Amino acid sequence: MDHTDNELQGTNSSGSLGGLDVRRRIPIKLISKQASKVKPAPRTQRTVSRMPAKAPQGDEEGFDYNEEQRYDCKGGELFGNQRRFPGHLFWDFKINILGEKDDTPVHFCDKCGLPIKVYGRMIPCKHVFCYDCAILHEKKGDKMCPGCSDPVQRIEQCTRGSLFMCSIVQGCKRTYLSQRDLQAHINHRHMRAGKPVTRASLENVHPPIAPPPTDIPDRFIMPPDKHHMSHIPPKQHIMMPPPPLQHVPHEHYNQPHEDIRAPPAELSMAPPPPRSVSQETFRISTRKHSNLITVPIQDDSSSGAREPPPPAPAPAHHHPEYQGQPVVSHPHHIMPPQQHYAPPPPPPPPISHPMPHPPQAAGTPHLVYSQAPPPPMTSAPPPITPPPGHIIAQMPPYMNHPPPGPPPPQHGGPPVTAPPPHHYNPNSLPQFTEDQGTLSPPFTQPGGMSPGIWPAPRGPPPPPRMQGPPSQTPLPGPHHPDQTRYRPYYQ
């Protein structure tokens, strides 16, 4: 009964008294049990929620870090790991490359280290990065170049192969749109400013190379005529006149030559070289005088100054002795007639020989002796009286130096009163003037030889005879027994 009572009491109490209590207790218990059972879960949830709560912070921090890493490593740890071990991932296996080699250089970004396909070029500092790094840094870096910290005005987008990067100096890395601009940058920034010693050495090396032409160099590329006029001309201008002057005696002796008159003016402008002053001066003056004497078309003022005045009639007693005798006039005037009948010999070298004999040269100071023949003479009767200063190399000794006094007549001919050569007056000589004419074509001689067929001289004529004049030897006439003895002089 106790048990039943207890049960009833329990039921009653539970029903009457404890109903509310039970109702109250059950939810409490249930709540407590649920709380006790659920508390660990919320704790775990809290811990989990705390972890995720921290995780987003970590994600945010990691996002920031990844952004920085993306700036530095292009996409965080994954790209960083690939960047750290590129050889193990790509270059360990053998590959077979097909296609042609691309010579376009590939540059790597200094921020992410990856090859650049599209450049982001900073203006005005001209440094390049990959376009993503350039844009990202422009947003974060307050428009400052990460390479040089210079302000960036704008960013150009360039494709691979369109830029030329300076690699002469480590750390320069400026880019240019053409090879010419890159070379100008190298010359301006690195060759001049960065290497003064090298520039000095180059300046020392270049000047000797520059005067020639290639090299050279822009200051050496000048017109050749200006160079010849300024540097080499003295010798060339002096050497140029002889060819036309040498040809004048053979071909153009009757024509006025502009190039004959021009070289003296040229020579007056250009100073001759010191080693050949005397030789060149004598040669040119000789040619000038001979041309002016023998070519009557020259200017009258200059020819009149140098030609002897018209001669006075010579004494009559000169004619009988010299008329039939082989007339030996200026040896240079004997040779030219052969040029009408035989091919001209090569002219000897134009070396002047001023005569050392003052008595011979004193009579005709206006003539200088040269081995080269002057232009040939044209038709006129031959001169009769030989000029004293011109009887040089091809005459016998006694004709080179006429006796000072009149020789004794031996064969009935009138005496020849020939004064000494230094007393000859050019005014009294019938000597190669425009009025009287010049040498004629060949004339006969007692020996049967004519000047037209005389052999051409092969070399310089023999030096002038230095013997003293024979005092009593008469001048030979056509009937002189010793005339044949002197024939070798003319053959």
Curated annotation (Swiss-Prot):
Zinc finger annotations (C2H2-type) as residue ranges: 164-190
Enzyme class at the top of the EC tree: transferase
UniProt superkingdom: Eukaryota
EC number: 2.3.2.27
Modified residues (Phosphoserine): S201, S285, S290
Zinc fingers classed as RING-type: ranges: 109-149
GO molecular function: identical protein binding; ubiquitin protein ligase activity; zinc ion binding
Pathway: Protein modification; protein ubiquitination
InterPro entries tied to this protein: HAKAI-like_RING-HC, HAKAI/CBLL2, Znf_Hakai, Znf_RING, Znf_RING/FYVE/PHD, Znf_RING_CS
GO cellular component terms given for this protein: cytoplasm; nuclear speck; nucleus; RNA N6-methyladenosine methyltransferase complex
Record field: catalytic activity: S-ubiquitinyl-[E2 ubiquitin-conjugating enzyme]-L-cysteine + [acceptor protein]-L-lysine = [E2 ubiquitin-conjugating enzyme]-L-cysteine + N(6)-ubiquitinyl-[acceptor protein]-L-lysine
Biased composition (Pro residues): 342-359, 372-389, 399-423, 457-478
Main subcellular location: nucleus
Disulfide bonding pattern of the chain: none
Biased composition (Polar residues): 427-442
HYB domain, as annotated region: 148-206
Pfam family, one: zf_Hakai
UniProt keyword annotations, A-Z: Cytoplasm, Developmental protein, Metal-binding, Nucleus, Phosphoprotein, Transferase, Ubl conjugation pathway, Zinc, Zinc-finger
Tissue-wise expression: Detected in heart, brain, spleen, lung, liver, skeletal muscle, kidney and testis.
Region annotation Disordered: where it falls in the sequence: 1-20, 33-61, 255-491
Family in the record: Belongs to the Hakai family.
Subunit structure: Homodimer. Interacts with tyrosine-phosphorylated SRC substrates. Component of the WMM complex, a N6-methyltransferase complex composed of a catalytic subcomplex, named MAC, and of an associated subcomplex, named MACOM. The MAC subcomplex is composed of METTL3 and METTL14. The MACOM subcomplex is composed of WTAP, ZC3H13, CBLL1/HAKAI, VIRMA, and, in some cases of RBM15 (RBM15 or RBM15B). Also a component of a MACOM-like complex, named WTAP complex, composed of WTAP, ZC3H13, CBLL1, VIRMA, RBM15, BCLAF1 and THRAP3.
Purpose of the protein: E3 ubiquitin-protein ligase that mediates ubiquitination of several tyrosine-phosphorylated Src substrates, including CDH1, CTTN and DOK1. Targets CDH1 for endocytosis and degradation. Associated component of the WMM complex, a complex that mediates N6-methyladenosine (m6A) methylation of RNAs, a modification that plays a role in the efficiency of mRNA splicing and RNA processing. Its function in the WMM complex is unknown.
Domain comment (free text): The HYB domain forms a phosphotyrosine-binding pocket upon dimerization, and mediates as well the recognition of its flanking acidic amino acids.
Record protein name field: E3 ubiquitin-protein ligase Hakai
Lineage of producing organism: Eukaryota, Metazoa, Chordata, Craniata, Vertebrata
Gene: Cbll1
